[in-house]
Amino acid sequence: DVIKAALDAEMGLLKNMGVNVIRQYTGVQPKWIQYIYENYGIYTMLNHSFGRYGLTVNGGWVAVTDYRDPATQELLMSEATALANDYKDTPGLLMFLLGNENNYGLFWAGAETEDFPDDEEKRAFIGEQRGRPMYKLMNDATIKMKSIDSSHPIAICNGDVLFIDIIAEECKDIDIFGTNMYRGASFTDAFKTVKEKLDIPIMLTEFGADAFNAIENAEDQKMQAYYMVENWKDIYQNAAGLGKAENAIGGFTFQFSDGWWKFGQTKNLDIHDNNASWANGGYSLDLAPGENNMNEEWFGICAKGPTNTRGLYTLYPRAAYYALKTAHQLNPYEEGVTPEF
């Protein structure tokens, strides 16, 4: 069985580095969530994209989801209801996650990351007109899912903290604020902001760094490992009991293996592209003035080998894998642990 072969190879590597939960999207059958848990002790956070990449509404494809549309609302509520019913009794399910930085999807379509619009008025207008209905619908879905399954927490996945004031007003029933966040070595004031605005736990649903140095135009494993370790240090220091924001409950490192599909999405899928798609000043080690430095296809803490006839490939851990293996051994809740760990 090709699925079992793929899982056994990857879950073994994940277990070895101390991973205790992975993020999977809907479409994975409950039996595989159970298989991963029973054989490797790894839980699943199950993620419904909630229209992030478009929807088929009344038989027609809609590329950019309009959360104000009644038919769209009905469709997403029915999918959320089915999600809770289908997975509520699955061994190994840890929690549900709704969306994937859907607030960014209000500005651009598709999964390919772009630079963000600078116009504050435009952002605020889109937040009110299109974002507020989306967040309200996410909260409605949360209420419905909790009426079916009261055993699993429900989080949303936001892009950074954009529109957090609207979230505070519209998402009063979510359990956890999930965020995809790329700020460099530190998450700066994120934990404090979430504590002040929402006062619920924060979970990093995506964070990390690529392993390609845009200045040197070459792989740079040390650079990637540095950002990974610094990010985890920040998460740990904001865990409960350590005297800072005390609201961080963990995170999902992005990503386990390189995504060769990320640049271009539908072309050159057999090429490991080194194009830098966007610029981020937080990652200063390979930032040149006026140049992009975020290499979407190089975020894996494992590199991919060639694909065999079964469609499988060998993974080759990078330095970040081993750095994270050490970092994962720390339990911030253990007696005697201090912020200076």
Predicted regions span which residues?
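Active-site mouth of glycoside hydrolases
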Residues: D1-F177, S186-F187, K195-L198
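A structural motif corresponding to the C-terminal end of an alpha-helix
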Residues: N16-G18, D86-G92, D140-H152, D234-A248, ...
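Active-site clefts of carbohydrate-active enzymes
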Residues: L55-T65, F107-P117, L198-N238, A248-K267
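Amphipathic alpha-helical segments in well-structured domains
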Residues: Q73-A80, M138, F191, Q221-W232, ...
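Short, glycine-/Ser/Thr-/acidic-enriched flexible segments
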Residues: R183-G184, A209
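Aromatic-rich peripheral "rim/lid" segments of glycoside hydrolase catalytic domains that contact
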Residues: F254-F341
